[in-house]
Amino acid sequence: MEFDNSFEVPLPPDRAWPVLMNVQGIAPCMPGAQLTEMVDDKSYKGNIAVRLGPVALTFAGLVTFEDIDNANHTARVRAQGTDAKGRGSAQAAATFRLEPSSTGSKVLVHTNLTLSGAVAQYGRGVGMIQATASALMNQFANNLKKQLVNPPDPAAVDTAVKPISATSLAGLVVWNSIKDKLGGKS
C-alpha cells in the first residue's frame, strides 16, 4: 500500500537537510524506534515497536539509504524488518524531499509498504495502517521540532522503546479528521 505524509520544520532546507540526514540524531524522535547498530554510513540496524489495533509488534530490521541527492534535498530509503515473535515482516520503500515553506521547510514523504504473514492480517484495514503511519509521522515531526528548538541534554535522553499507544493513535486519527474537515488548519 502507498501513502503520503508531510510535516514542517522551522529551518530552511539548507539547514534542515543535514539534520534529517543525521540518522543517529533523529532516531530518538521516532516513537518506538531504537538504533542498535550502524552497519555503514548508509545502513542502520534497529527496532521499532508499534501497535496495530490491539496487537503490539516489534520489528527488528535494516534501514538503508539507497539514493541521497544533497543538492536537491531528496533521498530514497529502503527498510525491512521481521516481527520479533515471528508473526510476519514489513518492507518499505520511502522517498522524501524538502521544499521551502513560509515557516522553514516542508518535508514530503511517499511510502510504499508491504506487510506479510500474520502482521498483514492484523493491519488488513488500509485505514488502520495509514492512521498508524500518520500518527507515527506526526509524533516524529513534533519530537523533531522540539529537538530543533531545544536540543536535549544527551545524558537526559530516555532511550526506552515505547510503542505508540492505541489511545494516542485514536486521538491523532480523530484530530487529523477534524483538521482535514477544517482545511488542514491546526
Whereabouts are the PLM-identified features?
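Intrinsic-disorder/low-complexity, polar/charged segments enriched in Ser/Thr/Lys/Arg/Asp/Glu/Gln
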Residues: 2-8, 43-45, 58-60, 74, ...
